[in-house]
Amino acid sequence: MKKVSDRILFNLFLNSGLTITEQKEFYKIAKPIIHHKEFVKRCSKDFPHHGSTSLGEHIIKDAIKTYVLAKEYTKTHFLKKADIKIAVLIALFHDLYTKPWQNSDEKTSVFNNDTHGMTHPIEAVLNSYNWFPKYFKNEKDAEIIIDGIIHHMYPYPVRKVENKNIKINNQKLLKKFKYYDYLIQTTKNITKLKIDIRPPKSIEGKLLVKADKLIALSELNSFNSIKALVNGTNKSLAKK
């Protein structure tokens, strides 16, 4: 029996322009992640991300677009290739936050340092490491993936990680996170502000930033879905 994440992926493949060989390459990377119970849960209507598009569908769209961009980059840059697997992993992990954000009981503001928009990349890093530890065994790869996830919202800021008491929904995971020191380093800057604004260091992370913006623009197709980005409330969706 196919999982809902497979049905979403195979439907998106139809208009992706990918060859059968490319689809197989992508699926080999994505399968262990999109089959995980936590990912499958995020493919339901209970996890709307942009408008009524489920979080799982959004992530898969981002990952396919990132894959396409990485292939194009590799074809046109002879001296510096993009690591396609790492790029796709960053895309598959970047929004694995803990709780749905639209119409939640938590008050939100685009100007609040602890709002979902500024903290969800941190939650995504911790959840990805907790659910998929094998992809973080190599320190160099882990740092590229973490940095790509953390800064995927650029030019929107991310919350600085100054200590283990920041307000996030999976804070307990922060206390035992192997790469906690790197998390501090990658969100650090010389200002006194509690936010960091910069793009990912790697080309793989930068490709996701581009893919994410393109996909988000196609999903934010109503006034209410756009307004939700500011106040967290989407009147077009049923109240949780």
Outline where the language-model segments fall.
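Metal-dependent phosphohydrolase cores
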Residues: M1-K240
